[in-house]
Amino acid sequence: LLPAANTVIFFFSHQVPDIASVFFGQQVTTSQVIDLARDLLAEGITHARDALDWPDIKDTLERAAKDFRIACGPDNGRWSTQQLPTDAPLWAALDTLQETLGEVSRTIEPATVRAETLAQVAERLHGLMESFEQWRNHSIMSQGEMICWVEALTYSVRLNATPLSVAEGFTRQRESDHMRTWIFASAT
């Protein structure tokens, strides 16, 4: 939670369930893909300009992320995966985004030996691939432990996996902190 803190204070303890569900949940966004694409372009041009067509790689990643947002429809909104039909356009767009991440990963792999920072961006890419895959697996196999939902924002999409109960994770966190004091306060 906070590795160096001796005391954990919750001033609005009546909000602990809401906050904990976000804390113990998982999320991945298309904004992360776009940020990664821009970082990949900067590092690629700086350290391996002659290796690949970095602007094209950036554009490919950005296009896949933006197409995923477009597939969610023109309006902002939130939908649980249970509300979405299996043939909803966003599923195909998510598949395309995941395939694009995989293709880019394979394409840039030989160039990552040129600079540590380029290798670090490649590691972020692998982390994003894992996050999208984990969310997809949760959305298929959560069996009542988590609710997976899609949040379409103006320019991005956020995929969330939120536990239905935070009791176990919260208790585990609290019990692992033998040397900390926990204080809960609420005005309500």
Model-assigned labels for residue ranges:
Residues 1-188:
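ASCE RecA-like P-loop NTPase motor cores
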